[in-house]
């Protein structure tokens, strides 16, 4: 059974990153000591390391460690072994392209179908439909397919 929280945004006016979601995330990820973060959407073009550090600061408030998928030698194994997964927002075209280039679209799909707790914000929620064809993001790259999870 799928165990997903899909949020249209990570930040609401006057609040810090994920602040409005943290109480729900503490419950959603209650059995997770660490969460695998997929920073591929890269809002504003920030680096994977910068984005991951930003997410670490937010999740530290609920005592959950964040590990960026880019920090692993094998992204497939990282997803398969993840206690929980978070895909952040940014550009959906870039995110989907990276998921295909790293050969993890189907691996991620299987993890979610098998109940791995998942959070997707913005682009990270866009990929949870059948296709990404409703996104209004700028097509800065062209993925090999618009098919998503």
Predicted regions and their residues:
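Short, conserved acidic/polar surface loops in the N-terminal third of protein domains
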Residues: 48, 78-80, 95-99, 130-131
